[in-house]
């Protein structure tokens, strides 16, 4: 299993993971129950339940480089462009800024 801490405005907003069943995102309890917290994406509204998907959630997939930059990333890091979680983990320290 691979797992990433998702930050929003320097606070742990949740956890993104990948296992043999696909991708999972869950909001951190402290973040979820803070009155000032907002969803990290319109497609991932605040909720207690885990989001599950067979593919990387589009919001996170959109953070991965594309085009010529993806080619450079693949060449330098020797990653397969189909390894979306690997690309995401290496391409960015996930810190979302409002």
Locations of the language-model features?
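Broad phosphate/nucleotide-binding scaffolds in NTP-utilizing and phosphate-metabolizing enzymes
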Residues: 1-98
């Amino acid at each position: 299993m691979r797992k990433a801490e998702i930050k929003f405005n320097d606070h742990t907003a949740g956890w993104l993971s990948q296992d043999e069943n696909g991708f999972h995102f869950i909001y951190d309890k402290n973040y979820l129950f803070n009155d000032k917290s907002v969803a990290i994406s319109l497609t991932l509204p605040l909720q207690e339940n885990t989001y599950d998907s067979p593919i990387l959630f589009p919001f996170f997939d959109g953070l991965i480089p594309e085009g010529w930059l993806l080619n450079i990333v693949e060449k330098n890091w020797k990653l397969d462009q189909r390894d979306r979680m690997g690309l995401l983990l290496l391409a960015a320290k996930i810190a979302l800024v409002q």
